[in-house]
């Protein structure tokens, strides 16, 4: 089950490049082997303009009473599955599902005369591991056709 946040602004992907480790023989310039190793953790970042109290709680922790959000006393651990959908283009859209992500949110812009406050969210992508110790893909990407909404049936 996903929570819909229709007002997410631009999303930034920070996919890390693999680090290469070269093995060379003494006196040789070219390596005899190159091994790729995962680099820094990959992450995505997005902003939510004028976040609600519930959106702040979901991304930063804390408590909500009515429309009032109170920041957490200590930094919480927030793990979520994230699904992103692009705007439609040529009858298709792209969907990304990040299976397990560590969420860290913060208010990054104060409200002003002509702008609203912004919630900046960084989601660090993690590899899911089952109870049996089996690792699975951390994310997937799929291009899907745009389908027309089904009108409600009349009785």
Give the label of every model feature segment.
Residues 1-56, 100-118:
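Solvent-exposed edge beta-strands and adjacent loop segments
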Residues 18, 49-53, 87-89, 101, ...:
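Generic structural motif
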Residues 43-47, 81-83, 120-124:
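Beta-strand secondary-structure signal
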Residues 49-72:
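Charged, amphipathic alpha-helical segments
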Residues 65-83, 140-155:
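Short, cationic low-complexity segments
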Residues 69-111:
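Acidic, glycine-rich flexible loop segments
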Residues 94-155:
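Mixed-charge, glycine-accented linear interaction segment located at domain edges/termini
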């Amino acid at each position: 089950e996903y929570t819909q946040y229709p007002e997410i602004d631009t999303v930034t992907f920070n996919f890390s490049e693999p680090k290469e480790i070269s093995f060379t023989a003494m006196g040789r310039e070219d390596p005899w082997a190159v091994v790729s190793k995962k680099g820094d953790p990959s992450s995505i970042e997005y902003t939510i303009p004028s976040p609600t109290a519930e959106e702040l709680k979901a991304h930063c922790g804390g408590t909500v009473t009515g429309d009032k959000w109170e920041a957490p006393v200590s930094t919480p651990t927030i793990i979520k599955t994230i699904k992103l959908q692009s705007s439609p283009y040529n009858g298709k859209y792209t969907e990304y599902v990040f299976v397990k992500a560590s969420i860290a949110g913060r208010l990054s812009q104060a409200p002003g005369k002509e702008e609203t406050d912004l919630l900046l969210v960084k989601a660090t992508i993690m590899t899911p591991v089952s109870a049996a110790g089996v690792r699975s893909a951390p994310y997937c990407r799929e291009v899907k056709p745009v389908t027309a909404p089904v009108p409600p049936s009349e009785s």
